[in-house]
Amino acid sequence: MKPRVFVTREIPERGLSKIEEHFELDLWKDEAPPSKKVIIERVKDCDALVSLLTDPIDAEVFEAAPKLRIVAQYAVGYDNIDVKEATKRGIYVTNTPGVLTETTADFAFALLMAAARRVVEADRYVREGKWKVAWHPMMMLGYDVYGRTLGIVGMGRIGAAVARRAKGFGMRILYYDSIRREDFEKELGVEYVPLEKLLEESDFVSLHVPLTEETYHMIGEEQLRRMKRTAILVNTSRGKVVDQKALYKALKEGWIAGAGLDVFEQEPIPPDDPLLKLENVVLAPHAASASHETRSRMAEMVAENLIAFKRGEIPPNLVNQEVVKVRPPGFQ
């Protein structure tokens, strides 16, 4: 008999078909995510769970699923999962790292470019019939990107990928990280500086850190006031890394020139959020990894993690390595 898995959203077929070869599949097909109540109900008899960032997976869910042995996250981040509790219960947690790196870096740079050159504003300007003069020397003035200074906060895989793109634009690249990356300094010519100096000297600041107690609201009023009035902030990491109220104030009052945001403190962003009324911010619906190729590869990685576990092997992308001491891999 195949082990049973609940998949909380319809993911690309390349992954689903592989999962279905090895598991009895229970798939949530609604576009809206299942509520926690629904997850608890559907996972009761499951051996495995495929989750997304919008799914709260905690002790209450684990308690309702005595057979649950693995949670395969369809994402790199996993702050929606109580990993400590999972480990205590001998539940393996996996994710999909690496595969998102290049497409997320593409998107971060796209937000940077769109905000700097006012691309979205210009599009609306044309569509709304406001373009009355063929050309005007002061129309839609933005900021150059080539040759400017980029500050990267978080020099991991994605931060380094953004740096590689910035090199092609002849940019000076500063970075701040909790760990100094001398390997990237040699490879990419990036310069390690304290966060304060990075904020003060950068024309663009791009955030690439995980959400932890240390990074929660690491960009707040104090940090935003340190930035240049002509600077642009880009966030493709986690919404709560930035104090959104302080950011609104900074954009509204002109402490900084603009922002490009793919993530927010509350997702979806409420329709009455004041950020939506500002012209100097480019907004996206947590879509940095949203390419056909990347999302399909993510689905395949989820399947690979599940299938390896079923074979009694340690999954290739295991988050909580210490769980191996609690329970060996497999559905035995």
From Swiss-Prot:
UniProt cross-references to Gene3D superfamilies, sorted A to Z: NAD(P)-binding Rossmann-like Domain
Single GO term (MF): NAD binding
GO cellular component, one term: cytosol
Residues of the active site: R238, E267, H286 (proton donor)
Residues that, per the record, bind NADP(+): M155, G156, R157, I158, T236, S237, R238, H286, A287, A288
Residue ranges crossing the lipid bilayer per the database entry: none
InterPro entries: D-isomer_2-hydroxyacid_DH, D-isomer_2_OHA_DH_cat_dom, D-isomer_DH_CS, D-isomer_DH_CS1, D-isomer_DH_NAD-bd, Glyoxylate_reductase_GyaR, NAD(P)-bd_dom_sf
Location of the protein in the cell: Cytoplasm
Known EC number: 1.1.1.26
Record key words, sorted: Cytoplasm, NAD, Oxidoreductase
Alphabetical list of Pfam families matching this protein: 2-Hacid_dh, 2-Hacid_dh_C
Quaternary context: Homodimer.
Similarity comment text for this entry: Belongs to the D-isomer specific 2-hydroxyacid dehydrogenase family. GyaR subfamily.
Designated name of the protein: Glyoxylate reductase
Source organism (scientific name): Korarchaeum cryptofilum (strain OPF8)
Taxonomy of the source species: Archaea, Thermoproteota, Candidatus Korarchaeia, Candidatus Korarchaeales, Candidatus Korarchaeaceae
Primary gene name: gyaR
